Each structure stands twice: as C-alpha cells, then as structure tokens.
A protein has these predicted regions:
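Catalytic-core helical/loop segments in enzymes performing group transfer/polymerization on anionic/lipid-linked
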Residues: 1-589
Length: 589
C-alpha cells in the first residue's frame, strides 16, 4: 500500500507524477483529500482511520512525554540562542519569546509522529509518495507564519505536513520512497510566503504616576479597561498600529547552531534534527531588528504588572515582556477560561504555555484547576441581570462548529475532526427533522467554520435549502438578543456567553465529541440534563422545544433553574459583584 500525505484533490502534481500516484493502491493521511462536498456522499478514497476515543489509558503518559519533550527542546534552544546572540538570559526569558511557537511545533509534530506510528502498525505500508521540496521552504518568518504553516489547512499550497512526514520516513528502509514533482508553473516557496504577515506593534499613549499597571492586547470589554484606569489612576490608550518595515538580517549558520547527532526512531532527536528548518527567523536572523525597535518604544519601563491576553503574534511585545520580566515586572494573563473544564490540558490552548514565567493566569470563574486564579468572565461585561422576555417575532439560533481537516490532537483518547463534524451534522439533521414545521422556519444557523471546505453547511443546505446561515461576520454576543433561544451543538465560547447573559440556552451533548471533562464540569452537565438545559439526544431536544417554545420565559426563569445557572456562572464564567475588589485581587496575587 502506498501512503499519501498531501491533498490529492488539489492536483498539484505534473502529469507524469499524477499518473504514477493514480495507478497505485493508495492510503491517504487524514487531510489527504477533500472529504467530499457532502457527508451523504461516500468517499472514493481510502483514508487511514487511527483515532480511537476509547483508548484513553495511556493519554496522561503521552501528554507528560509531550511536556517533557517541550521542556527538553526549550532547554536545548535557550542555550543555543544565548550563544548565537552573545547573551546570558535565563530559560524563562527565551520561553516568553519562543514558547507558544515551540509548544505548537512540538505538539503538532508529536501528533503526526503518533498518527504515522499507528498507520504503520495497522496498515501494510510498502511505499510513500514524496513531493520534491526544498527543506528551506518551511523556515517561517515569525510565530504567525509558523502557526499558519503548522496548523492552517485553508491554503491549497501548504505542504508543511507532507514535508514533515517525509522527514520522518527518510530513514525507514522498509518503505520505498516514490519521488514526485509539482507542476512546472508552481512556485511553492512564494505561495508559502503568502501565509506570513508583517510584524506589527501598537503605538500607545501612556500616563501614570507610578507605572503600576500596563495593559496590551488585553482581551476584556472596554468598560473594564475604563474602570481599571480610573481605579489605578493611569491612561493606557491605543493610538494606532505600526508595521516593522526595516530589517537588517544577520547571517547565522543554521547547520552549525542546530547541529544534532540523529538517533533513529527517537522523537526528541527528530525534533532537534529538523529545528534548523522550522525555527522562525525573527528569533535568529532578524532578532537584532527586534532589539533595535525595542529601544525606540514609548511603552512604560518596568511596570509592576503587565496585563495581556493573546500576545503570541506580536514579537516586539513579547520581547518587551521578556525584558521587563527580567527587571521584575509581573506578567498576568487573562485568557480563554474554557481551559479548566477538561480533565487534561489542551496542549495548544491558552493554558498551554509553561506557567513558570507568568505571575498568574486568571480564570473565567472560581474553578482554579491547573493553577488558574479566580477572576471574572472577560468576553462580556454587564452589571445588570438580563430579564428575558419571549417575543413572537424572534427566532431560534443553532450554533454549530466545523473543525479543521488538519488534526492537531493525539490519535488515542480523542475523536478525529472529520468524525466530530459528522456527529454535529447528524445531530443537527436529527433535530431539524423532529422540529415542527411551524417552528422549522424560525431556526437560523450560525457556523463557526475552521475548515477549508464548507462541508457541514453544504450538507445541511442540501436537505434544508431555506434555512438562513451566518458565519463569522458577526460575533455571537452581537446577535444573541435577536433570538429567543440558542441551541448549541458544541461546547464553545458562545455556550458560556449565552449562560453568562442569562439567555435561554440548550446544549446538545454528545460525549464522543470530547475527551475527558473535569469532574466539577461534569456535575453541572448532569444538573443541566436533569433540568432540560442539556440533552444527549437531538430529537428529544427538538421535541422539548416543540412543547415548550411559547413557554420559554417561564421555563428559563424558574428559581431552581436560575439557581443552577448562577452556580455554573460563579464556577466557569463569573460575574463581577464589585470591579474594584476584582482589581484589588490582581495586586494581591
């Protein structure tokens, strides 16, 4: 059997290479084809099936090994970077700069390593179709570019994963390599560069008597920012965004800097062996530009606290954090609070960065699992309790997720993304079939699509052509009050927003979509099921809505149900009773 790890439907090969591939008995990697335009069609290709949700037994050990590999490579890299740049910074300093890139790179590489291992054990792989590509094509400009190469399946010419797996198979003597060529008019290198974007930073107007608080890329409502400026008596206002345009790249011998004696079939050795082809230029050849720009910044020097949320892609701000951390500043992260609903860490999620250099990470509520500190829900802010009023002219909004074709999780202990998308599709169809005709026309669908092909939308439209669809053009919190009810087929941010805003909410819960949950969260799922807020069967949810739609107000406002919802909010999407007290808690952390 011949293994293919590029998208065969993209037809990137020249005629000769394509004829070679088409004659073979092929097995495709999970992202190796279009997966059809509809779930109703049978895939004409044989796609490897290696994801097993029930095999969770060794998942904790795999995740520990993943963390160990990350720390081992970080330790190796920070010494090399100090030597290359003639510095003497500690490991935490460099982790602030390269940590998010490195964590994603290690995790995604390990996922592919484990997927490939399972394919080799399950299928009789005799050969591998390899496209001839230069290793240097995949050296990223910065963290954003690296993440687009590693995680994006949107771009037709993104062959990073194919290249990565081909490097894993280079020393497998039992597998024959069939060399293929691209069409003559394709310039993959220039296409991959299009995935990058310029390094930018914000011009800030800042005034303070004591430099106590500085926030940047802080994802909280404007009301909270205004109140915290009043409370701590400072001004922190973004004026505009600037682009770094002038670079003076410095030459480094990557072969020499990243030299590693390769050990076959050793994952950590493999990582060290390919790092020279994957390490972002901004931390090596263009690091002098970052240092030069840092000296020109008008941001406050040595603030006591730096508040931020998603600093991953602004390299200059990360350097600012590293320099000020080195000088004693405390870095506080307010991030996506969903991290603490799962039993195991999401290795690519907001809590994924090693916490040694962060003074604190603030949660969305009281659940302090994984070291998170209590804070409030930062996606929305309100001091008023929403008193829902049912209105006949309002409708029902279905919230669907469509996950990427690019797998980013380990094969044991999780479902693959395509299977999850199909579960969401089947649940949606089951729900729509059961909804009464008079109510069916009141249903709109909002899809948060993260994949290349709109298969979920296409599949639903084939059966229900008149349903109105919306995408990411408007965020959920901007449309929620236009509807009487939201029905969620996936536990995502909109689910928490809806409950926080006290809008009628129903969750269609299928355990096959998720890995293991935190015990506290599971207890609330059980309470939600008992109180008809959550259903494990989409048809039963539809039947409940058929019988209770005009009575939603009474159902949602019942004291027992409201008590459970308030307890859930307190734990997972906390409301502020006193903003000033919440701010005080920051300075006491």
């Amino acid at each position: 059997m011949n293994l293919i790890t590029f998208n065969i439907d993209d037809k990137l090969l020249n005629k000769r290479s394509y004829s070679i591939v088409s004659k073979k008995k092929n097995l495709l990697f999970h992202f190796g084809c279009q997966h059809n335009k509809s779930f109703e069609k049978i895939n004409k290709y044989r796609v490897a099936k290696v994801y097993e949700l029930n095999k969770k037994g060794n998942l904790p050990n795999k995740l520990k090994y993943l963390e160990k590999s990350y720390n081992e490579l970080l330790k190796n890299l920070y010494k090399k970077l100090n030597k290359a740049h003639n510095k003497n910074y500690d490991q935490n300093y460099w982790e602030i700069l390269i940590g998010k890139w490195l964590k994603t790179f290690v995790h995604q590489t390990y996922s592919n390593w484990e997927i490939l291992k399972k394919i080799e054990n399950k299928y009789n792989i005799k050969s591998f179709s390899k496209i001839s590509l230069s290793d240097n094509f995949f050296i990223p400009e910065n963290t954003w570019h690296a993440h687009q190469l590693i995680r994006s399946s949107q771009h037709k010419y993104n062959l990073f994963h194919h290249w990565l797996i081909s490097k894993m198979l280079e020393n497998k003597k039992k597998i024959k390599i069939n060399h293929l060529s691209l069409k003559n008019n394709l310039s993959i290198e220039s296409e991959l560069l299009k995935l990058s974007k310029p390094n930018k930073y914000q011009n800030i107007f800042y005034k303070s008597l004591d430099n106590k608080i500085f926030y940047y890329l802080w994802d909280v409502p404007r009301k909270i920012k205004i109140e915290i400026m009043k409370y701590f008596k400072f001004l922190n206002i973004r004026l505009n965004t600037k682009t770094i345009r002038e670079y003076h790249p410095k030459y480094f011998d990557r072969d020499l800097i990243f030299y590693n004696e390769y050990q076959p079939n050793n994952f950590q050795s493999f990582l060290k062996n390919i790092i020279k082809f994957t390490f972002p230029k901004i931390f090596l050849e263009n690091f002098n530009t970052l240092e030069r720009m840092y000296k020109k910044l008008n941001w406050p020097r040595k603030p006591k606290y730096i508040l931020t949320s998603y600093p991953y892609y602004e390299e200059l701000f990360k350097l600012y954090c590293a320099q000020n951390y080195f000088s004693g500043s405390k870095i506080i992260i307010t991030q996506h609070g969903m991290c603490n609903i799962f039993q195991y860490d999401d290795a690519l999620g907001p809590a994924s960065i090693n916490k040694t250099f962060f003074h604190a990470q603030l949660s969305w509520g009281k659940n302090r699992k994984k070291g998170l500190k209590k804070f409030l829900f930062t996606k929305k802010y309100t001091t008023k309790v929403n008193k829902f009023k049912f209105k006949k002219n309002k409708k029902i909004l279905l919230i669907l997720y469509s996950l990427s074709e690019m797998e980013d999780r380990l094969p044991n202990g999780y479902s693959d993304n395509n299977s999850i998308n199909k579960i969401i599709y089947n649940s949606t169809i089951k729900y729509l079939k059961q909804v009464e005709k008079s109510l069916l026309k009141k249903n709109d669908i909002k899809i948060l699509q993260n994949n290349r092909y709109p298969m979920l939308k296409n599949s639903i439209k084939k059966k229900y052509r008149n349903i109105k669809f919306m995408g990411l053009e408007k965020s959920f919190d901007k449309v929620i009050f236009q509807y009487n009810l939201s029905v969620h087929f996936f536990i995502g941010t909109p689910f928490f927003e809806s409950i926080y805003l006290n809008q009628p909410t129903i969750l269609i819960f299928d355990s096959k979509i998720y890995s293991s949950f935190d015990k506290k969260f599971l207890r609330f799922i059980k309470k939600f099921i008992d109180n008809k807020i959550c259903f494990t069967n989409a048809a039963e949810a539809a039947e409940f809505i058929n019988n209770n739609y005009t009575n939603l107000e009474h159902w949602w406002k019942s004291p027992k149900r409201q008590k459970i919802l308030n307890e859930f909010c307190e734990m997972f999407c906390g409301k502020s009773k006193n903003l000033h007290e919440d701010f005080k808690s920051i300075t006491k952390i």
